[in-house]
Every structure is written in C-alpha cells, then in structure tokens.
Curated annotation (Swiss-Prot):
<feature type="transmembrane region" description="Helical; Name=3">
    <location>
        <begin position="117"/>
        <end position="137"/>
    </location>
</feature>
<protein>
    <recommendedName>
        <fullName>Probable aquaporin PIP2-8</fullName>
    </recommendedName>
</protein>
<feature type="modified residue" description="N6,N6-dimethyllysine">
    <location>
        <position position="3"/>
    </location>
</feature>
<feature type="topological domain" description="Cytoplasmic">
    <location>
        <begin position="96"/>
        <end position="116"/>
    </location>
</feature>
<feature type="topological domain" description="Cytoplasmic">
    <location>
        <begin position="180"/>
        <end position="192"/>
    </location>
</feature>
<keyword id="KW-0677">Repeat</keyword>
<dbReference type="GO" id="GO:0015250">
    <property type="term" value="F:water channel activity"/>
</dbReference>
<feature type="modified residue" description="N-acetylmethionine">
    <location>
        <position position="1"/>
    </location>
</feature>
<feature type="transmembrane region" description="Helical; Name=1">
    <location>
        <begin position="37"/>
        <end position="57"/>
    </location>
</feature>
<keyword id="KW-1003">Cell membrane</keyword>
<keyword id="KW-0812">Transmembrane</keyword>
<feature type="transmembrane region" description="Helical; Name=5">
    <location>
        <begin position="193"/>
        <end position="213"/>
    </location>
</feature>
<feature type="short sequence motif" description="NPA 2">
    <location>
        <begin position="219"/>
        <end position="221"/>
    </location>
</feature>
<comment type="function">
    <text>Aquaporins facilitate the transport of water and small neutral solutes across cell membranes.</text>
</comment>
<feature type="transmembrane region" description="Helical; Name=6">
    <location>
        <begin position="241"/>
        <end position="261"/>
    </location>
</feature>
<dbReference type="GO" id="GO:0005886">
    <property type="term" value="C:plasma membrane"/>
</dbReference>
<dbReference type="InterPro" id="IPR023271">
    <property type="entry name" value="Aquaporin-like"/>
</dbReference>
Length: 278
C-alpha cells in the first residue's frame, strides 16, 4: 500500500482531493447557499417519503392477487426516487436525503458538524411532512395498512433486523463514497448521471433483500417520519433499530472507504514523513 502512495506521488494525479471540511465552520451560517442546501434537503426528503410511502400504501390496498406494484415495484419506487432526487439536488446540497449518508460523510470530513446537524433536522422534518401528505390524501387505507412504518416482520429477531439494517446501510453509504470519489468524478465528469445511478440502484437492490425483514429502513428519516405520523406502539418499539443500524452501517462504510480503500491513514503518514517540519 505504501508503494502505491509513493508511486502516486511520483507520477502525479489526474484528480484533486478536496480539503477536509472544518469540524465547526461557523462562517457558512452566514451564507445563503447553506440555507438553500437545507431547504433542498427538506423538500427532497418530503418528496421521497410522499412518493414511496404512497406507493407502499397503494400496493397494500389492492385486493387482487395481481394488483399493486409488488415488492419489485416498491423497491423501484425507493431506488428510482433516490436516483431522481440525488440527480436534482446533488449540485445544491450534495443530495444526501438520508441522515445515515450525512453521518457517514461527516465522519469522512466531507461536511461540517453544523451542516450535518442541520441536514439531519431538515431530513426528519421533510420526512414527517411527506408522510403527513400521504395520510391526508389516503386517510382510510393509511390507518388500516400500517402507515408505511418500519417494523420487524414476524419470524425475525431483533438481532436479525439490526444486522439487515447495518448491512443494507453499509451497501448504500459505501456506494455513495465510491460514486462521489474525487478520482472517479474526475475521470467520469463527462457523464454527470453516473453518481446518482449507482446510488439509486443500491437503494433498489437493498430493498429487494430487506423488505421481507424490516420493510427496509436504511434511512432514519424515512423510518422516523413514518413512525411519527402513524404513531403506533409496535413501530415505536422497534424504532431504535432504524437509527442504530443505519448509523453503524454508515460508520463501517466510512471507515472501510477512507482507511482501507483510500488509505487515508497511510497517505497522511507519508505526507508527514515528506514534510517533517509541518
């Protein structure tokens, strides 16, 4: 690995790693772009929850054996909306739409602490509003069919559900890091759709695997918004899983990408050795 670092230094790079975000960047609180990004995260999460939870309720409301979109259609709704919304908001807020993604990027020093906290609050509020619209438009089936809330399915243990959420979120956040890696972005800059596409597809694939277990959280805002509006005891009993699992998965993905794939620790050591006066 150290050989790779030394060779990279000799031959130069065709990309530039952005500097790490400061932990407390209070200056950005004075910028309109900061608040514009928060609004973008709020609206994007609202739209995400409205479309996806409405799809879930609409499917469950069908009575025929061939009615509704099925598990595959639900997975496409979640993955497709992430693809669309990341494409629309990436240039404004980064297109997080998920506190676990924001947490992972914060750990990797991609965003500051104030921005991370503001994003998470906006995402949770947007999720509540999005599910609130679903309840307002589909009141009767919403109450009868579970409100799109995440719960542990019958036959699965809490540990299994937690593990599924950790692995599912790891897949998502790892894909986010890989799709937005500076090296990849520089070499694929002529195809701007490449970052949102694998992220949306990762969400789609994880839903296929995890819907039978937990309904698929991998997004604490999605789970929180549905739990708040549905306000059912079972949803709240299981709710901690949909925060702990995604945050642990995001932590693991950030560590794997930054310290194993990108060898951040080795590069920092090499930089220190080449500049001993720093």
């Amino acid at each position: 690995m150290s050989k790779e670092v030394s060779e990279e230094g000799r031959h130069g790079k065709d990309y530039v790693d952005p500097p790490p975000a400061p932990l407390l960047d209070m200056a950005e609180l004075k910028l309109w772009s900061f608040y514009r990004a928060i609004i973008a995260e709020f609206i994007a999460t609202l739209l995400f929850l409205y479309v996806t939870v409405a799809t879930v309720i609409g499917h469950k409301n069908q009575t025929g054996p061939c009615g509704g979109v099925g598990l595959l259609g639900i997975a496409w709704a979640f993955g497709g909306m992430i693809f669309v919304l990341v494409y629309c908001t990436a240039g404004i807020s980064g297109g997080h739409i998920n506190p676990a993604v924001t947490f992972g990027l914060f750990l990797a020093r991609k965003v500051s602490l104030p921005r991370a906290v503001a994003y998470m609050v906006a995402q949770c509020l947007g999720a509540i509003c999005g599910v609130g619209l679903v309840k307002a438009f589909m009141m009767t089936p919403y109450k009868r069919l579970g409100g799109g809330a995440n719960t542990v399915a019958d036959g699965y243990s809490t540990g299994t559900a937690l593990g599924a959420e950790i692995i599912g979120t790891f897949v998502l956040v790892y894909t986010v890091f890989s799709a937005t890696d500076p090296k990849r972005s520089a070499r694929d800059s002529h195809v701007p759709v490449l970052a949102p596409l694998p992220i949306g597809f990762a969400v789609f694939m994880v839903h296929l695997a995890t819907i039978p277990i937990t309904g698929t959280g991998i997004n604490p805002a999605r789970s929180f918004g549905a739990a708040v509006i549905y306000n059912n005891e079972k949803a709240w009993d299981d709710h901690w899983i949909f925060w702990v699992g995604p945050f642990v998965g995001a932590l693991a993905a950030a560590a794997y990408h930054q310290y194993i794939l990108r060898a951040a620790a080795i590069k920092a050591l090499a930089s220190f050795r080449s500049n001993p006066t720093n």
